[in-house]
Amino acid sequence: MKRDLYETLGVARNADEKELKSAFRKLAMQYHPDRNPGDQEAEKSFKEINQAYETLKDPQKRAAYDRYGHAAFEQGGMGAGFGNGFAGGSAGGTSRHFRRHLRRDDGRRSSAPLLGRSRTRCGPSLQHGDHPRGGLFRQDGADPRADVGHLRRLHGLGREAGHQPEDLRHLPGLRPYPRRPGLLLDRTHLPDLRRSRSDDHRSLQQMPWPGPGHRGAHAVGQYSDRHRGRHAYPPLRRGRTGLRGGPPGDLYIFLSVRPHEFYQRDGADLYCSVPISMTTATLGGKFDVTTLDGTKSRVTVPEGTQAGKQFRLKGKGMHGRALQPDGRPLYPDPDRDAAEAHQAPARIAAGVRADLVQGEQSAIDGLLLPHERFLRYTERIATPGFRLCPSP
């Protein structure tokens, strides 16, 4: 398989003329036959470098290569619009005939001529599991964030390891041109569909369909995967490269917030459950809640507070440009930890009150242990360097 011309020169696909010339001069001096007498490999590399530079420095040849790859310069290939393979025929008239028998890369019939005036197409949006053929590679309505699975093993080779590419020109849907006597089309042929586009991993790849067990039919589509990194927002024009020289698509990022061990989020509001003792719920008292910034806010519990009672701390919730300037509220929810659910009495006798105070101080019944664990947690998250959402 022929080597990618950009890879041969060691430049990016969007390299300008100055970068191409600089890379060519550097490699030409390195592999020049005069500097490597008798070295056949150096001579071969020198010829490849010259061929790559001669192709890419010409705007028309470069555009044809970007669209069709090496097939643009082969006899009867997609680049035959430059005059090869038609024996004086009109590329425009021939393209109208091609249009009736070929489909676009996304499975729909093309409204633009295939040769000569091929229109560009915006690249597909880079979503996990998204392909130009839509329902061909996944069921309609499926979550685009679902794993691609089998497609991960292809790595742009167009086939699984250990399997040779197959001749696909006889398959249904890949209709060759009708061979009618007297037509110039007899002198043309489809591009070699046996060739997997490993020379251009960024756009076209051949992938098995309908599944891992069927290696007979292939189709041209896009392959996407998950990537982790920092991205500017909004992430526009960061998708796959467009087909036939078109602009790149958009990049869509799906965000999911991992659950926190203490806070529960509902929009911009935060909720948390705070364990308190039966004595505090019955007699009243106070407890501290650690907020997102590590500071503590004291909540006063009135006498006779029942389980599930919500308290509101104004301005202690989420902050952001789209939220209120002082933040949204934080709702501590007292959760009395006891062996059995019970209600705190609204009124209590003086003697019982004294017994409860004594039990609060001694903690014989162990009801204070959950609250003590909560206090230790709040002290831990208030220490410098603690992160509420540690990196995975």
From Swiss-Prot:
Region spans: Disordered = 103-142, 157-244
Task: Spell out the Low complexity composition-biased ranges.
Answer: 171-185
Regions of compositional bias (Basic residues) in chain numbering? 227-241
The record's InterPro entries line, in alphabetical order, gives:
DnaJ_C, DnaJ_domain, DnaJ_domain_CS, HSP40/DnaJ_pept-bd, J_dom_sf
- What UniProt keywords apply to this chain's record, in alphabetical order? Chaperone, Nodulation
- Note whether Chaperone occurs among the keywords: yes
Here the segments flagged for biased composition (Basic and acidic residues) are 157-170, 186-203
GO terms, biological process:
chaperone cofactor-dependent protein refolding; protein refolding
Query: J domain spans which residues?
Result: 2-71
- SMART domains per the record? DnaJ
Which GO terms fall under molecular function for this chain's record?
A: unfolded protein binding
Q: From which domain of life does this come?
A: Bacteria
**Keyword Calcium on this protein?**
no
Q: Name one GO cellular component term.
A: cytoplasm
Q: Which Gene3D superfamilies match?
A: DnaJ domain (1.10.287.110), Urease metallochaperone UreE, N-terminal domain (2.60.260.20)
Q: What is this protein called?
A: Protein NolC
* UniProt organism field: Rhizobium fredii
Q: What does the organism's lineage look like at the top? A: Bacteria, Pseudomonadati, Pseudomonadota, Alphaproteobacteria, Hyphomicrobiales
